[in-house]
Amino acid sequence: MELNNIKPADGAKKDKRRVGRGIGSGLGKTAGRGHKGQKSRAGGFHKVGFEGGQMPMHRRLPKRGFVSLTKGDTARVRLSDLAGVGVAEIDLLVLKQAGVVSGAAKAAKVYLAGELGKAIKLSGVAVTKGARAAIEAAGGSVAE
């Protein structure tokens, strides 16, 4: 076998049907388009979703939900990220300056992930129950 001898197996490829080439072909005259109507004519088709003038499905169904404008405003902070800040008293501004949260964040919440090796004082930042217990166990405090 060589590259110039390779060919598909017998019956693997069907010949394309040539439409509109006489009644003997089985697809002559109307060429499989039926008689009359918009779809039988050249260039005659409708836009996607068009239902012949009846109210289309995408307009019959009610709208649902909304896009929250405040969804991305609260940043999530790992407990282990607080240890790398290098400041004893931490608030939202300190977290932004340290690059722990983005500058666009309007609030932050600390959750229990990782270890906290030193005492810190947290203020103006939300805290989960587990993270609060870990901060207080390390000798730190949380002020609302």
From Swiss-Prot:
Residues 1-57 are annotated as: Disordered. Residues 21-31 have a biased composition (Gly residues). Keywords: Ribonucleoprotein, Ribosomal protein, RNA-binding, rRNA-binding. The keyword Ribosomal protein applies. It holds the Pfam family Ribosomal_L27A. SUPFAM superfamilies: Ribosomal proteins L15p and L18e. GO terms for biological process: translation. One of its GO terms (molecular function) is structural constituent of ribosome. GO terms for cellular component: cytosolic large ribosomal subunit. Binds to the 23S rRNA. Belongs to the universal ribosomal protein uL15 family. Part of the 50S ribosomal subunit. This is Large ribosomal subunit protein uL15. It comes from Thiobacillus denitrificans (strain ATCC 25259 / T1). The gene is rplO.
